[in-house]
Amino acid sequence: MCSLAAGNGQGAELGPEPLELSDSGDDAGWEDEDADAEPAQGRQHTPCLFCDRLFRSAEETFSHCKLEHQFNIDGMVHKHGLEFYGYIKLINFIRLKNPTVEYMNSIYNPVPWDKDEYLKPVLEDDLLLQFDVEDLYEPVSAPFTYPNGLSENTSAVEKLKLMEARALSAEAALARAREDLQKMKQFAQDFVMNVDVRTCSSTTTIADLQEDEDGVYFSSYGHYGIHEEMLKDKVRTESYRDFIYQNPHIFKDKVVLDVGCGTGILSMFAAKAGAKKVIAVDQSEILYQAMDIIRLNKLEDTIVLIKGKIEEVSLPVEKVDVIISEWMGYFLLFESMLDSVLYAKSKYLAKGGSVYPDICTISLVAVSDVSKHADRIAFWDDVYGFNMSCMKKAVIPEAVVEVVDHKTLISDPCDIKHIDCHTTSISDLEFSSDFTLRTTKTAMCTAVAGYFDIYFEKNCHNRVVFSTGPQSTKTHWKQTIFLLEKPFPVKAGEALKGKITVHKNKKDPRSLIVTLTLNSSTQTYSLQ
């Protein structure tokens, strides 16, 4: 949110006439006298962008802004390469948000006004919106023109345009460098200082999301359909049940916290296993159905239900002995619910307590499915006789969640991430990893698939493990597929070396950005 300026841009008093933008000579004086001769009620005035002064033209306004506020509209337009619509959005953004000049001058790409909502005029008959922004790209004075049509400063203008283009490119490169530098600083700080999970910047990404920002996520879990799908996933639900029922010593007479309890199935398993008290927390509307379910099963004396985010609610106890949660998303980390579990661990888990599941791994495997690749990518080359190949740029960067036929696998799997929920921190959930895929077939590599495995191990008399991989029983998580823009041939026995980087989307920290490098090619994917 930008800081607010002192003025609101809606003043009514016309100040002294400022200097003109350009030196128009003696003619300017005659024009001013003519303007003064016009009836006062016929004049059209426009307010300054940063104070309540009124002016008769856009040029006067811009001159005032430059002299009095150190805001150069010419420089702003050239700095960001603004054309007609970009200029309109800029003016309306300033009118609507009232930012300070310091804030405006500090902006680098991407700009905050690049939204369609700023095409709507804030002021009726705003003279600044009637200004032709192309004038700012023209020479200030008209040069002498020779009979052949060439002007005396043609080369200078061309040089100026070239310099402006280079300046814009340098601005963009500088912005990227600053962003990279900030990431490096944060990484170094986390690595050296081992920042506590309650204070590191990644922690607050999810914890600090406001209700209007996170509403879609929680509302999606308010409908019974998604819970029905999860409950019917036997691999998932029976693994939790078997872990709890086959290891009752972990729950007997213990205080248990269920983070994101949904319908309360894990809480009821824990209660049946002998838990002294189960505290079940969920922000979604499904909690009201969970209350009825708990009463129907006569477990209300053991299970306490609390509606809200674990980062915001107050629990009836200071510490718990066990934390259970089914937090896994597509590619394990999608939706960033593990952040909330780690927050709960940091704040509520007693010394010597346990979090389940406790061990998780993410793996990659190479895929050869030429027909599937053609169906999604080559399809756009000829759509009813029309070339729509430009659509590939939108299709390829989206990771696909679907079941991979195990017959299409052409390599051994490779683990790229190992998570121990007892020791990991939120900053660890954004990572880079080198990997090697050893091919088992001679084929065309068309994609890389990702999946995860879950382990219930700590203090377990009966260890429970399940996999979401393509060679295991299908789960509702399926697999996450990263289609390659350019498939390439491989021979059995090859070692495909690559690198993967996973981090949260800054605009939506519950979604993921995945960058994959393989066969000397790099592609960035979104999972949202």
UniProtKB/Swiss-Prot annotation:
Catalytic activity: L-arginyl-[protein] + S-adenosyl-L-methionine = N(omega)-methyl-L-arginyl-[protein] + S-adenosyl-L-homocysteine + H(+); L-arginyl-[protein] + 2 S-adenosyl-L-methionine = N(omega),N(omega)-dimethyl-L-arginyl-[protein] + 2 S-adenosyl-L-homocysteine + 2 H(+)
Sequence similarity: Belongs to the class I-like SAM-binding methyltransferase superfamily. Protein arginine N-methyltransferase family.
Residues engaged in binding S-adenosyl-L-homocysteine: 236, 260, 282, 284, 310-311
The protein's name: Protein arginine N-methyltransferase 3
Record organism: Rattus norvegicus (Rat)
Assembly with partners or alone: Monomer and homodimer. Interacts with EPB41L3 (via FERM domain); the interaction is direct and inhibits the protein-arginine N-methyltransferase activity of PRMT3. Interacts with the 40S ribosomal protein RPS2. Interacts with ALDH1A1; the interaction is direct, inhibits ALDH1A1 aldehyde dehydrogenase activity and is independent of the methyltransferase activity of PRMT3.
One GO term (biological process): transcription initiation-coupled chromatin remodeling
SUPFAM superfamilies: beta-beta-alpha zinc fingers, S-adenosyl-L-methionine-dependent methyltransferases
Compartments, as annotated in UniProt: Cytoplasm, Cytosol; Nucleus
Region (Mediates interaction with ALDH1A1): 184-528
Domain (SAM-dependent MTase PRMT-type): residue spans on this chain: 214-528
Extent of Acidic residues compositional bias: 23-37
Keywords: Acetylation, Cytoplasm, Metal-binding, Methyltransferase, Nucleus, Phosphoprotein, S-adenosyl-L-methionine, Transferase, Zinc, Zinc-finger
UniProt activity-regulation remark: Inhibited by N-ethylmaleimide and high concentrations of zinc chloride.
Chief location: cytoplasm
Expression tissues: Ubiquitously expressed.
